[in-house]
C-alpha cells in the first residue's frame, strides 16, 4: 500500500486564518492517524498578495497549535524546494512536455513576442472522481475552456503548479476547502495528460458565521486569526480541539479532547457534508475546560510571562499571590487575559455599590451590626485564608444573625459585590487594608438608611 502523505500549502499572505488552520489540522490528523507524513509547501507565486513575514508567521502559528511537519521550507527534505517561487524551472520543463505532445499551445499577445501556454481541454469527455467526503463528483469537459498553465511572465497558474508539486512530492491525499471543487477537473486533466496516478481528494465543508453566511475576513465581530487567540491566552490544545470539531463528529462521549485523542478518533467517514458553524461560545467553553485541567501555577506563570496584569505595586511574593488569584477564578476563566477583568472587578481602589447591593442594605436592618462585627474581627486577625475562614465561622456560630443575610452582608461589605468566588481566599488576596476600607465605606452607606 502506498504510504499516506498529505500537505498544507498556504500562500504567505499574512497571519494564519482559522479556515486555513482547520485545513492544516485535518490534513495533519489524517496523516498522524494513518502513520503517514504531513508536509508544508508555500505557494508564493502571486507576489502581489505576498506579505513580508507572512510565511514565518504561518509556520510559527502552526507550531503553536501543535502541528509539526517532516518536510517544508524551513527544514527542507528530499523533494524540495518547498517554495513555488523556487521551482519555476520545474514548471517550465513540464509545460514544455505538454507542448511537445500537442496537449498545450502557446498563446501570443497581439503585438508581443511573449506568450502564455494554454492547456488543450479534451472535447466531449467526462471527468469524475470519488471525493472522500462528498462521494462521486462528475464534470463535463465542454463546461471548461482551455486554461492557462504558464503565464507570459514564466510563472505557473495555480492548477498547473499544484499538480506538478503534488505528484513530485508524492502526495497521496488532499484535504482542502469546498471552494476547490471546481479546480479539481482541471487538475485531473493535467494528471491524465502526464499519465500520473490521481491522489484522493476530500473537500471539506464551509465554515459559517453566526448569521449562517460563509465566514469572511470582513466579519469584524469574529476574531479570525490564530495569533489573536494566542495573544488573549487561549490554549493551543483548546484551539486544536475546537477547530477539529468544525466539520468532524468524533465517535466520543465528550467533545473535550486532547490532540492525541483527536488523532486516535479521526475518521474520514465522520467528516460532515453540512457546513460547520463557528461558535465562539463553544470555543470559550472548550478553552475553559482545558484551563481547568491545568495547575494554577502553570496558568500563573503564563500570565506573568505575558504581563497581562500590569500592577503599579506588585504584592509581596507576586508569583505565589498570582497562583492563588488564578485558583480563585480558574473555573470562570474563558481565556487567560480575562484575569485583568477579574482583577478590575474586585480590586478597585475606590469602593462602589451597585443598585442591587444598595437595595439589600436598605431592606436588611441587621446589616449594620453584621458589618461592624466583621470590621472588629478582621481588624485584629492575621489576614490569611484559613484564619479568615475560621473567623467567619466563629461570627456565624456565636451570633444570632440569619445566615443568608450574614453571608450576603459579608460579601457586599468586604468586596462591594453581590456575587463572587470563595470569600476567604478573595479577602486574603484583597488584603486587610482594602477589606477594612471597603467595610468602612459600606458601613457609612448602610447607616444612611
UniProtKB/Swiss-Prot annotation:
Record carries keyword ATP-binding: yes
BP GO terms, sorted: glutamyl-tRNA aminoacylation
Residue interval(s) of motif 'HIGH' region: 10-20
Catalytic reaction annotation: tRNA(Glu) + L-glutamate + ATP = L-glutamyl-tRNA(Glu) + AMP + diphosphate
Annotated GO CC locations: cytosol
Chain positions recorded as ATP binding sites: 217
Location of the protein in the cell: Cytoplasm
UniProt keyword terms in alphabetical order: Aminoacyl-tRNA synthetase, ATP-binding, Cytoplasm, Ligase, Nucleotide-binding, Protein biosynthesis
Domain of life: Bacteria
Motif 'KMSKS' region, chain ranges: 214-218
EC number, as in UniProt: 6.1.1.17
GO molecular function, one term: ATP binding
Record keyword rRNA-binding present: no
The protein's role, per its UniProt record: Catalyzes the attachment of glutamate to tRNA(Glu) in a two-step reaction: glutamate is first activated by ATP to form Glu-AMP and then transferred to the acceptor end of tRNA(Glu).
Protein family: Belongs to the class-I aminoacyl-tRNA synthetase family. Glutamate--tRNA ligase type 1 subfamily.
HAMAP family according to UniProt: Glu_tRNA_synth_type1 (MF_00022)
Subunit field text: Monomer.
Cited NCBIfam families: gltX_bact
Name of this protein: Glutamate--tRNA ligase
